[in-house]
């Protein structure tokens, strides 16, 4: 968040690291850890506090206002998608907390994650191959370092287990594009 200054950029990088954790977990296990989502919320709260204490309270208040509206809207829409089986609860929570941080860029974030999700559907065979290879190497790395995975990656189970999309990847891609200003010259 450029509005929050240098600290905002620092906190954005921390959030991107947590988003990467959520996306990899979603790819491997079709599960976004609550710990990742809660950690993002805590980083966002710390960023707002740092901005307010650092004399940038106006920017913090602006983000709090616009971000809250977007987050609540995404939670409501996401809850309806969850009820119909179209989206997982972890995806909804992750999209909501990232919509908060995106603030005034939340619409662009939501458009981008939808577009990336659509591309994932078109490239489903490639996605399945990536899931299988990632799962294979994650297991091998765990064994090599003496820390085997607690459960089998979804890509190695195949069949019905691979049903659905790891939408955390689309959420992460959309968020990263907004944070790095990939489309800022267009919008």
Predicted segments with their positions:
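A membrane-topology feature that recognizes alpha-helical transmembrane segments
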Residues: 1-187
């Amino acid at each position: 968040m450029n509005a929050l200054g240098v600290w905002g950029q620092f906190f954005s990088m921390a959030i991107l690291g947590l988003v990467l954790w959520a996306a990899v977990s979603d790819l491997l296990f079709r599960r976004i850890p609550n710990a990742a989502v809660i950690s993002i919320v805590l980083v966002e709260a710390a960023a707002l506090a740092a901005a307010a204490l650092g004399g940038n309270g106006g920017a913090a208040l602006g983000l709090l206002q616009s971000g809250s509206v977007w987050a609540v809207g995404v939670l409501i829409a996401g809850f309806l998608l969850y009820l119909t089986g179209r989206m997982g609860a972890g995806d909804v929570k992750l999209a909501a907390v990232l919509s908060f941080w995106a603030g005034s860029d939340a619409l662009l974030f939501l458009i981008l994650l939808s577009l990336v999700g659509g591309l994932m559907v078109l490239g489903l065979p490639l996605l399945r191959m990536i899931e299988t290879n990632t799962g294979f190497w994650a297991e091998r790395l765990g064994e090599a370092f003496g820390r085997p995975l607690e459960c089998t990656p979804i890509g190695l189970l195949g069949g019905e287990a691979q049903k659905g999309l790891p939408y955390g990847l689309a959420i992460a891609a959309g968020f990263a594009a907004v944070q790095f200003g990939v489309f800022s010259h267009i919008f």
